[in-house]
Amino acid sequence: MGNDTLANMITCIRNANLRKTKTVEILATNTNRSIAKILLEEGFIDELRERQEDTKRLLVITLRYQGRKRKPYITTVKQISKAGLRVYSNHKDIPRVLGGMGIVILSTSQGIIIDREARDKQIGGEILCYVW
């Protein structure tokens, strides 16, 4: 049984949002790094850093909140494609999340990208997760 680092990342972000924690540390894999960069570009997180701890490289994600009540910018993160059931889509069938308010993160032949880029480039791929 292998480690599902994407599921771990999603769970850490979800739990941190529930506890209103400022930062989250996750294992730095290429997939996690790419997804975190997308979240930073789309404005869901405030900051992204990498740090070395002994032999492990960790991503330190600073979550973004709004207002005095600290409402998280990431309302929901939902993993779609899982180890037991992969979900693929061509560019025409990529779903829209909340009418375009959320994003779909895909793994394609051109790297990990969001749904808008995939539609523009007319490429499909594996649907990793929804974020809104």
Swiss-Prot record:
Domain of life: Eukaryota
GO molecular function terms attached to this record: rRNA binding; structural constituent of ribosome
GO biological process, alphabetically ordered: translation
Signal peptide limits: none
GO annotations of cellular component type: chloroplast; ribonucleoprotein complex; ribosome
Gene3D superfamilies: 3.30.1370.30, 3.30.1490.10
Plastid keyword on record: yes
Keywords: Chloroplast, Plastid, Ribonucleoprotein, Ribosomal protein, RNA-binding, rRNA-binding
Broad class of where this protein is predominantly found: plastid
Cited InterPro entries: Ribosomal_uS8 (IPR000630), Ribosomal_uS8_CS (IPR047863), Ribosomal_uS8_sf (IPR035987)
Cell location: Plastid, Chloroplast
Subunit organization: Part of the 30S ribosomal subunit.
Family: Belongs to the universal ribosomal protein uS8 family.
Protein purpose: One of the primary rRNA binding proteins, it binds directly to 16S rRNA central domain where it helps coordinate assembly of the platform of the 30S subunit.
Protein name: Small ribosomal subunit protein uS8c
Lineage: Eukaryota, Viridiplantae, Streptophyta, Zygnematophyceae, Zygnematophycidae
